[in-house]
From Swiss-Prot:
GO molecular function: oxidative phosphorylation uncoupler activity
Quaternary organization: Interacts with HAX1; the interaction is direct and calcium-dependent.
Species, as recorded: Canis lupus familiaris
Family listed: Belongs to the mitochondrial carrier (TC 2.A.29) family.
Known role: Putative transmembrane transporter that plays a role in mitochondrial metabolism via an as yet unclear mechanism. Originally, this mitochondrial protein was thought to act as a proton transmembrane transporter from the mitochondrial intermembrane space into the matrix, causing proton leaks through the inner mitochondrial membrane, thereby uncoupling mitochondrial membrane potential generation from ATP synthesis.
Protein name: Putative mitochondrial transporter UCP3
Subcellular location: Mitochondrion inner membrane
Top-level division of the source organism's lineage: Eukaryota
Amino acid sequence: MVGLKPSEVPPTTAVKFLGAGTAACFADLLTFPLDTAKVRLQIQGENQATQAARRIQYRGVLGTILTMVRTEGPRSPYNGLVAGLQRQMSFASIRIGLYDSVKQFYTPKGSDHSSITTRILAGCTTGAMAVSCAQPTDVVKVRFQASIHLGAGSNRKYSGTMDAYRTIAREEGVRGLWKGTLPNITRNAIVNCAEMVTYDIIKEKLLDYHLLTDNFPCHLISAFGAGFCATVVASPVDVVKTRYMNSPPGQYCSPLDCMLKMVTQEGPTAFYKGFTPSFLRLGTWNVVMFVTYEQLKRALMKVQMLRESPF
């Protein structure tokens, strides 16, 4: 590594793992209200809402956030943030941080180029691994985001994040913390493939054709394209996942039952409820995360090189 710039030194797996989790947490801090708005729009129309909650109608991303602030207070768009950050540190670290390592594992020996099939396999693998580890944090995050508290006198089911884990495990069993794992694995396999493979390919082509250098504009364009593709392919699964994870025991027999009830009761357009906030969320999140991730990798490699330098 002597004589090389930090940007020229291949980052280690540990650097990618730490950088991905940190960058994802930073992206979540900036975009969490958009995610909460998406969840509220996705569950709107369900029959489980209280009478007071049914009177609230959410219209659009900004309208949803403003309605939440007006009826529930300024902190409401950040309900579930702690669980969200816990999720990203375990979830993004695996699905993004380990993507290159798994891609290299699937690449045939002697080949210096990864095929699209190899990249898709890597995306599916790290996405499934991440869900297996982070599912309880996702369940708690969605429960907080979906809960409506109209004033100081309203009942709060959970007093805090740790209480939510305990309450769900006590009332629904440990399996309650893993509710919706199958649709979530499906969703994140799709999202991870769309995000990572699209980002990988766009960035590779921009560099191969010398359209851009490996810097901010290249990362920005690649991340935006990744966010758009991920939203288009993942929205239907995302809506089913949100509805199923937020549902009380007995409302849906399975994710498939949830999907069928959505079609019969609300029509096929229900699968794209919250599409705009989903795109704003994923698009913005991808831009912030990937740009931060690329810079963090370089910064961490620079620190590592300084520590290893004899002078």
